[in-house]
């Protein structure tokens, strides 16, 4: 069982049933605490103690409203004792900008006192829910340890992601223990390729212009800065306001956003 704090500023102590669980001071990144050993049957007490200033405040002292407290969602979640801890996806294009290159790395964690033999698999589905890539591999995870599993696939004539046509594929990562599926994680995947390279056009100094390319096409950035701020709730920004901001950006032909000066809430990227 994990306690997940999406964001709190600036120094955070967590206590369960009067026992200190841990400390975090990275205000704009999530903090997770494994809390099993602090819990008891029945009702439990959870206390989060927040300090306005911490040793991390020097790095976080940027030009914005300095508001302290819980700034994002806080929730509990549970996973099997042997579970998918993390994963990383690379989804880009080859030099033709037509074919997809897919790479998946999965970290499996084992919180038991004995080694575990599990199976990790994935499926990549297109918009019609057709499987376009799949794979599976056995995974031996040592007691109280972690193991990485990697997959690669090449996809011909993928539906690429662009701002105008944001085609997405659905990735399903599964974990089986003893032949039984214990975990399935869904994730959206888009195939696109970013490059910064010189063009054939020369500037007045005789040197070629250097441009940003997405899927082989030069892109002119029309961007804005955005802060995580709400006139009614301070630094807590609900999903409805995020969507409203994106709608306004689209209406004004904005195609890029600079996040000032920190990672945004996970929902912002999704």
Identify the role of each PLM range:
Residues 29-33, 145-153:
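Short strand-edge motifs at loop-to-beta-strand transitions and within beta-strands
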Residues 172-251, 269:
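N-terminal carbohydrate-binding accessory modules
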Residues 18, 74, 106, 169, ...:
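Conserved, mostly hydrophobic/aromatic
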């Amino acid at each position: 069982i994990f306690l997940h704090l999406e964001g709190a500023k600036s120094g955070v102590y967590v206590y369960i049933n009067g026992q200190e669980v841990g400390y975090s001071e990275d205000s704009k990144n999530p903090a997770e605490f494994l809390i099993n050993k602090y819990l008891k049957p029945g009702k439990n007490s959870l206390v989060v103690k927040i300090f306005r200033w911490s040793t991390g405040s020097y790095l976080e002292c940027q030009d914005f409203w300095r508001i302290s407290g819980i700034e994002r969602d806080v929730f509990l979640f549970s996973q099997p004792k042997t579970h998918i801890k993390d994963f990383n996806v690379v989804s880009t294009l080859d030099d033709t900008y037509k074919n997809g290159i897919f790479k998946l790395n999965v970290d499996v964690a084992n919180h038991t006192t004995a080694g575990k033999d599990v199976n990790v698999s994935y499926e990549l589905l297109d918009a019609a829910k057709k499987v376009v890539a799949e794979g599976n591999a056995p995974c031996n995870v040592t007691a109280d340890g972690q193991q990485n599993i990697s997959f690669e696939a090449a996809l011909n004539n993928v539906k690429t992601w662009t701002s105008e046509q944001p085609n997405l594929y659905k990735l399903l990562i599964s974990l089986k223990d003893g032949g039984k599926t214990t975990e399935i994680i869904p994730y959206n995947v888009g195939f696109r390729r970013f490059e910064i390279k010189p063009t054939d056009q020369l500037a007045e100094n005789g040197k070629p212009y250097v441009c940003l390319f997405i899927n082989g096409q030069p892109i002119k950035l029309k961007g804005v800065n955005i802060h995580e701020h709400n006139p009614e709730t301070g630094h807590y920004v609900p999903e409805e306001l995020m969507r409203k901001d994106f709608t306004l950006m689209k209406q004004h032909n904005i195609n890029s956003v600079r996040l000032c000066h920190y990672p945004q809430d996970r929902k912002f990227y999704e």
